[in-house]
């Protein structure tokens, strides 16, 4: 979609065109709210999410997105309430547990902590759900200074996550060999030091392009 390639104006135009055809289409409304969130138009995004929920209170996608938005702007109590609402609808959506854990200071009597332990032992969860739940329990045990239990859960989360990622080190190894070979071949290039051309440095955030620009300049 246009939103995924940062063509926000075009994406918004198409969403609004869709709403002219079907003004109550929750899927389009949710996408429009997500777009507003990306553009830091948080009040508009909140209004749209609430519009969806006024018609469909159990719209999990809208609840989740609104909860995340409240978390982003520091409205943690509102965020936690919505994540708990998700768990009432679908207790297996353990990403909500993980998000709640980031906003909670746990002791061993905390009801949510007890619920997560019971969920781990009593429910049949997918690997993805287990990843989120183990991360949440890792945080909860860390709050209680039970570092062995915390490490155990973080390790389980990372081990399952690694399995799900299907990461192949050999692919990256071959890729870096090609990069190294290409870099070494640059020594054979004859440069015309008398020519002057504009050089544009383009890169992703945090990719080192600012440092590259400083070195060249």
Regions from the PLM with identified roles:
Residues 1-217:
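Alpha-helical solenoid repeat scaffolds of the TPR/TPR-like class and their adjacent stem/linker regions
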